[in-house]
């Protein structure tokens, strides 16, 4: 296993394409706000300072808030395997 750390920026009002990761994901919102949209769950507003755990294989497509969002994301990943899978449907780009 390996841990991948990403600095993720979502522009104001932009939606990340629907996708999932085979491993668990830990998100800490550094700046701005976002809405976490996850299949099968109610939309979750997030603000700077909030954290959230996304379970393995959870299809999600976050949306940047009015000022956008910046998050540090820690992803547990099996080394050598694909880390992100796009899912067609609403929010797909």
Regions found by a protein language model. Name each.
Residues 18, 36-37, 59-66:
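Short beta-strand His + acidic residue motifs that chelate non-heme Fe in jelly-roll/DSBH
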Residues 10-11, 39-57:
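Short acidic-glycine-tyrosine-enriched beta hairpin
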Residues 1, 13-26:
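A short beta-loop-beta micro-motif enriched in histidine and acidic residues
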Residues 22-40:
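Glycine- and acidic-residue-biased ligand/ion/polar-headgroup-sensing regions
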Residues 18, 26-28, 53-54, 70-75:
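Structural recognition of the beta-strand scaffold that forms the well-ordered cores
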Residues 15-16, 33-37, 51:
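Short beta-strand segments in beta-sandwich/barrel cores
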Residues 1-4, 63-93:
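Double-stranded beta-helix
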């Amino acid at each position: 296993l390996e841990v991948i750390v990403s600095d993720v920026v979502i522009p104001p009002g932009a939606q990340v394409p629907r996708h999932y990761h085979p491993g668990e994901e830990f998100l800490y919102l550094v700046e701005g706000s976002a809405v976490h949209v996850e299949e099968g769950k109610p939309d979750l507003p997030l603000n700077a300072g909030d954290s959230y755990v996304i379970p393995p294989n959870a299809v999600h497509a976050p949306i940047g808030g009015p000022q956008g969002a910046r998050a540090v994301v820690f992803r547990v990943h099996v080394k050598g395997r694909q880390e992100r899978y796009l899912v067609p449907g609403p929010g797909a780009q």
